Each structure stands twice: as structure tokens, then as C-alpha cells.
């Protein structure tokens, strides 16, 4: 490392973040917030008194996520990859929580928090004043210049984003004459007013009592009565679409709406550009603003909407009653299986309203969900918002452990206490049983799985299970680590992974693809694409290949033929799914660089690389083609929508660069200089604290929506640097750092 006798003993890290003018009037004393954790669960708490705050000083972790300054020992500037790893790890290990995991926000979609706030308002559960302030601050920090909000942060204003967050801010106490509300209202009316919101927005306005059910595309619950073998049964749909639809159909079937009150009456006046009583509601069913609609409706979708409307006119009462009872059973079982969390906050909110309608506010259902409201909430630099899930606890922890193994950190005695704690968390997070009513409620078996977030959330995910198995096998091989997770439990996980394979090879996320692709023709979300069924993903498939081959080396006799056949089919899928441009397309990260990183690692497990595989040659050529002059890579989120590599307008990004370097190293790319330049870019972007600063949105959820995965800039970068040193030696890169 470069040393300097004049180097300060400490360095101050800071967020380099400031509130917008509108947000600056809101917020709380950030020095009073503390993060409580429990087996991956996150609960931000505001300490009311100065005495409490003194007794429990803020940690570096809390200060970092809140955007407060923090003081750390100064680190010499790295000139070698492993020195950068050392500096990065010295910082990142401080973000481990008390229960052993690495957690963070995965916010981005701008309708999740608003749905939860609307649901809580309707049920009559007040929100703590400090949470209200921070929710307001978040929205006013991510507001667009025109005063509106989009589908996700950093996206153009839409009716859906604007009307949902307008209603949320009014519920939280902002008056209609507040400058932020006036600007939002002007944008809303310019885009077509609330009547032009998509179906999801119409639903939320209906339950709030500020839109009429006659203006909705019908959402009948009767598909639940269709034989499970037919594609129109929700059991054949993507798991998130299924969960949202079931609760929406229950509330639609009952025409549930909040009784009018003073705020509801005011919103009826504020949200529309004509008097509420004069709106022709049936004419609004397919009225969706051009700013919201992803594609124009097809004649099939128009015909489907007409058929639903006709059916609703002539519905059979006893079938409707049966369907509503079945919907309620599905909602109750989902809530019970997930310990009141539900699969994600979007369906949590609509499920809460359904259970409130069925059982009342004093039921154990609502009490249990009230206590879980905090779980997906994360207090980040902009304020408080719901994440897309109840966190990323298991996923980020597994990737972090992998990074320490790759960089040789895990074998060092000074790191083993930290990583034993991480292993303990992974141990505690494995799901040990199948869900109640597994087949009736369309669930994939979960015994032996690892979840994306927490065991309580209880959903099996193919790649999180795969990554967990891989790091458990590797970590438990290292001297000094206990064998916390038995051979039997690892074998259960392998059984589960093998059971999730799709016919013909390849892996989805939550469950094998169940429905035919033509269901996408009936997609009435207007907002998203490819959300009617699950899909095959190169990133999930590659994680499975890496996991199975790692497991097979340690346990060569367990289901050897099944594993070999699955890996072979998975490799065939990767070769089939490569794009003509040479890359692979991701659905969970941005985008070609992300999936290509995974695919090249998966192919490398079977000995395929640039020297012997045409697919790897094309992939290396693709990545090298898009390297920027500064040595980095930067890919725009717009790639997800347009299906072609688009450079990021702000230039190179740490995450995309790490992905590309990992992929090129996995493929044994012969262009050492290009890889060296990528590594040098990562080292130049490292701060004096050892951290890397936030950049562009890292993740994708339901294309084209973007979301944050802020830990990606740490563990993938540490992986890239560690693997570079392992492959090319820990050479001095001082000349490249000038």
C-alpha cells in the first residue's frame, strides 16, 4: 500500500447527500434512530429521549445507512487488488448486523409504501409521528422536477406513481395547498387525472373510496374455481401476480370501499379535473395515460376485458360466493404460512384489507400484520420507505461470504468470528418444513430451501438456495468453522433445487414455469411485461450450476446422476439463451453485464472458457466491446426495456464493472490488459474509508421497474478484486491508478 507519514489517523465518511428544499421541512433527529434485528428481521426504532440515545450510541452501520458522518481509522491507499480487498472488507464488515447478516434496503418501486399506508389508514391503525415525518421526507427527496412520481425512483412521472403518493402524503398530513401537493396535483391533471391511472391504481383508489368500482376492469375471483390443470387458474401464474390478484379479486368481489370521510371527500375533489359526480365511470375502465401504459392494448386484451365485463353482468351468485370463500382461504393460508408477512409488501397491503373485511380490526390477523408493518420498512438516506421485500438478508449474506472466500479472507483467523456469525445466521435461515396446504395454495415445497430474505417469509428461491448451499459447503471446509449445517440438511436443499428444474433445463426463481406463455397476452397490468408466468433466468440457472458442482465435489455419491443430468441440461439452456450480441439478458439485475457474469461462471464450472467454447468467446467479445475509456462498464436500466445494451448516461458504474470483470475472469479471457483496466477502475473508485459510493439502480423487479441493491457494490466488487489476484497475481497497479 502507498503510505504517507502525513496521512491522518482517522478519516470521516459521509453520505454526500442533502435533502431537497421540499423535504428539508420534514424528517426527524437522525441521531436518535437505531436498527433492531432478529434473524434477518429489520426494525428501525426512534429513541425518544437523549438519555436513551446516550446509553445506546449509534453504530457505524446505523450512521452509514442514515447518511450521517462516521469516523474510521485511515487506510493506506491501495496499489494492489488484495490491498483494495483489505480496505473494502475493513469497511464492509462493519455493516454486519448483530444477528450475523448483511442487510439493506431494496426500495425503488414507488407504489409499495403508499399501498401499505393506504391499507393502514383504512383499517384505522395510526402511524407513529416519526415514521410519518420520514415517509414524507423520502417522497419529497425522490420527487421529480415536475412534482410527480414515476413507477420507480428515477423514472418519469406517471399517473400511477403520482396519484398513489399524492394520496399517501395527504393521509400523512400534508394539506392540499402545500407547494409540493399543488405541484403534484398539476402534474396529475396534466397527465390525465386519477381516472387515467392503470388498473392497479384504480384498485387502490377504489378501496380508499375515491374511485368507483364500475370504472374497474373486472377482477373476478372465479378463476380460483377453474381446474388447477388449466392455465386460467391462478396457480399457473407468476407467484407475485397470483398473490396480488387473489386479494384484489376478493375485495373487488365484495366491492369493498372505505366509508367516505372528510379526507375522502377532499380527495374526490382534488384528484380529478372534472367534478366527481360527473365522471362516466364505465368509460374509465380502459382509460390509461400514455405515460403509464407500457404497450398499447392488443385486440386480445380488449376482447378479454369485454368478456370479463359481460361475465360480471351475468355472474352466478353461488359461484361467486364459493370463489370469494376460496379467495379468503388462500389469503388466510398465505398470511399464516408467512407469519403475517406475506410474500411481499404489495400483497401484504391488499391481504390486510381482505382480512380486515372478513374478520375485523381486532382479529389476530390484523394484530399480527400490524406488528409486521415495520419489517419491510428501511430508513435510508432519503427517508423511510418500504422495500420490495422484507429485506435481502439471506441473499446479501451468502454473497458476502462468497466474496470473503474468493479473496482468501475467510481463512484468516481475525475474520472467523464474523463469518461464524454469518454461518450461524445462514443456519438459522434454512426453511425446515413445507408450507401448510402446499398443493391447495399453489406453493412450491420449501423443506430444505433458503429464502431471499428471512425464514419467516418462507418462500423458496432457486438461486438463494443455491448460493447458500455453495457457501455453506465451502465455508465448512475451512479449518476453524463448525459444521453447523448437516449433510442431511444440505441434501434436502439439493433435493429441493433438483425439484425446481424446468422441463428441458433451466431454472426460474420461485417455482418452475407452470403456465403457457400465451397468458402474457392477457396481461392487464398495463405497467409490466412478462409477469403472468414465471420465466427461465440465466442468473438463477448459473447459480444452480455453481451450487450443484460445488456440492458434487464434496459429496460425489449423492444423487450423482441426477446432478450431472441437471447440470448438463442447465448448460444447454445457457447456450440456447445467449443473445445474438453475445451476452445474456438478466431479469433481476442490470442487465447484460449482470446475467453474462453469472452465465460465464456457470459455463466455467463445466470447463468452458474463451479458449474452447464459442459462446464464451462471443460473450468476452461482447463485454470488451462495451468497456469504457476509463476502464469501467456502465449499463443503463433502459436496457431492460429495449432489450439491447445501452450505456449509462453517467458513465461507468462500480457494479457493472465488477460484473464484467468477474465474467471475463471466469471465461479466462485472454485480454489481460482490459481486465486490469477494469480492476484499476474499481480501485480508483474506492474511497479513503474503504467503501464505494452509491451509483445507479442495481436491480430489476418486474421489467421495466428498477430497484436498489446497495450491497452489490461491496460484495461483487470484493469478488472481482479477489478473483483477479487469484488468477493474475497480486500485481502492483500503481501505474494504472494515475
UniProtKB/Swiss-Prot annotation:
Pfam families, A to Z: SQHop_cyclase_C, SQHop_cyclase_N
Residue stretches in coiled coil: none
Signal listed as a keyword: no
EC number in record: 5.4.99.32
Gene Ontology MF, one: lanosterol synthase activity
Residue windows of the PFTB repeats: 132-173, 490-531, 567-607, 616-663
Source species, domain of life: Eukaryota
Function: Protostadienol synthase which cyclizes (3S)-oxidosqualene to (17Z)-protosta-17(20),24-dien-3-beta-ol (protostadienol), the biosynthetic precursor of helvolic acid, a secondary metabolite which promotes virulence.
The protein's name in its UniProt record: Protostadienol synthase A
Amino acid at each position: 500500500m502507498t503510505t504517507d507519514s502525513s496521512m491522518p489517523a482517522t478519516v470521516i465518511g459521509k453520505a454526500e447527500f442533502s435533502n431537497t428544499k421540499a423535504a428539508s421541512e420534514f424528517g426527524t433527529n437522525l441521531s436518535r434512530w437505531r436498527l433492531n434485528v432478529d434473524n434477518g428481521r429489520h426494525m428501525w426504532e426512534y429513541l425518544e429521549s437523549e438519555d436513551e440515545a446516550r446509553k445506546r450510541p449509534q453504530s457505524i452501520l446505523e450512521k452509514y445507512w442514515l447518511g450521517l458522518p462516521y469516523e474510521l481509522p485511515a487506510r493506506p491507499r491501495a496499489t494492489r487488488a488484495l490491498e483494495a480487498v483489505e480496505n473494502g472488507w475493513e469497511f464492509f464488515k462493519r455493516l454486519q448486523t448483530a444477528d450475523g447478516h448483511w442487510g439493506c434496503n431494496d426500495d425503488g418501486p414507488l407504489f409499495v409504501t403508499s399501498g401499505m399506508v393506504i391499507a393502514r389508514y383504512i383499517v384505522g391503525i395510526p402511524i407513529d409521528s416519526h415514521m410519518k415525518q420520514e415517509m414524507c421526507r423520502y417522497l419529497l427527496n425522490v420527487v421529480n422536477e415536475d412534482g410527480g412520481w414515476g413507477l420507480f425512483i428515477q423514472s418519469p412521472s406517471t399517473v400511477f406513481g403520482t396519484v398513489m403518493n399524492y394520496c399517501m402524503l395527504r393521509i400523512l398530513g400534508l394539506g392540499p395547498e402545500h407547494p409540493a401537493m399543488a405541484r403534484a396535483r398539476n402534474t396529475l391533471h396534466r397527465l390525465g387525472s386519477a381516472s387515467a391511472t392503470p388498473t392497479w391504481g384504480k384498485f387502490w383508489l377504489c378501496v380508499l373510496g375515491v374511485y368507483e368500482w364500475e370504472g374497474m376492469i373486472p377482477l373476478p375471483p372465479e378463476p380460483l374455481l377453474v381446474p388447477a390443470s388449466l392455465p386460467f387458474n391462478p396457480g399457473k401464474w407468476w407467484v407475485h401476480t397470483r398473490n396480488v390478484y387473489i386479494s384484489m379479486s376478493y375485495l373487488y368481489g365484495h366491492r369493498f370501499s372505505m366509508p367516505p370521510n372528510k379526507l375522502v371527500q377532499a380527495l374526490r375533489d382534488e384528484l380529478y379535473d372534472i367534478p366527481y359526480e360527473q365522471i362516466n365511470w364505465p368509460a374509465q375502465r380502459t382509460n390509461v395515460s400514455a405515460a403509464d401504459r407500457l404497450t398499447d392494448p392488443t385486440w386480445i386484451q380488449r376482447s378479454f376485458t369485454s368478456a370479463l365485463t359481460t361475465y360480471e353482468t351475468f355472474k352466478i351468485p353461488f359461484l361467486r360466493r364459493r370463489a370469494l370463500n376460496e379467495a379468503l382461504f388462500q389469503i388466510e393460508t398465505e398470511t399464516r404460512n408467512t407469519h403475517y408477512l406475506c410474500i411481499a409488501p404489495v400483497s401484504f397491503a391488499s391481504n390486510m384489507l381482505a382480512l380486515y373485511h372478513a374478520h375485523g380490526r381486532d382479529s389476530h390477523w390484523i394484530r399480527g400484520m400490524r406488528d409486521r408493518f415495520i419489517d419491510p420498512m428501511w430508513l435510508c438516506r432519503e427517508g423511510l420507505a418500504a422495500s420490495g421485500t422484507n429485506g435481502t438478508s439471506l441473499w446479501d449474506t451468502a454473497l458476502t461470504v462468497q466474496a470473503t472466500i474468493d479473496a482468501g479472507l475467510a481463512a484468516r483467523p481475525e475474520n472467523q468470528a464474523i463469518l461464524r456469525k454469518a454461518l450461524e445466521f445462514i443456519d438459522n435461515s434454512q426453511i425446515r418444513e413445507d408450507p401448510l396446504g402446499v398443493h391447495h395454495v399453489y406453493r412450491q415445497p420449501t423443506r430444505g430451501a433458503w429464502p431471499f430474505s428471512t425464514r419467516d417469509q418462507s418462500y423458496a428461491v432457486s438461486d438463494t438456495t443455491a448460493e447458500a448451499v455453495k457457501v455453506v459447503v465451502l465455508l465448512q471446509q475451512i479449518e476453524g468453522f463448525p459444521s453447523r449445517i448437516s449433510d442431511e440438511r444440505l441434501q434436502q436443499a439439493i433435493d429441493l433445487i433438483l425439484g425446481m428444474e424446468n422441463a428441458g433445463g433451466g431454472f426460474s426463481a420461485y417455482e418452475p414455469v407452470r403456465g403457457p406463455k400465451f397468458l402474457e397476452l392477457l396481461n392487464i397490468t398495463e405497467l409490466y411485461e412478462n409477469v403472468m408466468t414465471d420465466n427461465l433466468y440465466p442468473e438463477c440457472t448459473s447459480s444452480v450450476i455453481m451450487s450443484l458442482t460445488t456440492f458434487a465435489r464434496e459429496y460425489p455419491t449423492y444423487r450423482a446422476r441426477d446432478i450431472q443430468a441437471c447440470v448438463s441440461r442447465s448448460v444447454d439452456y445457457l447456450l440456447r439463451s445467449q443473445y445474438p450480441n453475445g451476452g445474456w439478458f438478466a431479469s433481476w439485475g442490470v442487465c447484460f453485464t449482470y446475467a453474462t457474469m453469472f452465465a460465464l461462471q456457470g459455463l466455467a464450472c463445466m470447463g468452458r472458457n474463451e479458449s474452447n467454447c464459442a459462446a464464451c468467446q462471443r460473450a468476452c467479445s461482447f463485454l470488451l466491446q462495451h468497456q469504457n475509456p476509463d476502464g469501467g462498464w456502465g449499463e443503463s436500466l433502459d436496457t431492460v426495456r429495449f432489450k439491447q445494451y445501452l450505456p449509462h448516461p453517467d458513465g461507468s458504474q462500480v457494479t457493472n464493472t465488477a460484473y464484467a470483470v468477474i465474467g471475463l475472469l471466469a471465461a479466462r479471457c485472454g485480454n489481460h490488459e482490459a481486465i486490469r483496466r477494469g480492476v484499476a477502475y474499481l480501485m480508483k473508485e474506492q474511497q479513503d474509508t474503504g467503501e464505494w459510493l452509491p451509483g445507479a439502480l442495481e436491480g430489476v423487479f418486474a421489467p421495466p421497474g428498477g430497484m436498489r441493491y446497495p450491497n452489490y457494490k461491496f460484495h461483487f466488487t470484493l469478488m472481482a478484486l479477489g478473483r483477479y489476484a487469484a488468477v493474475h497475481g497480486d500485481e502492483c497497479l500503481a501505474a494504472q491508478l494515475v
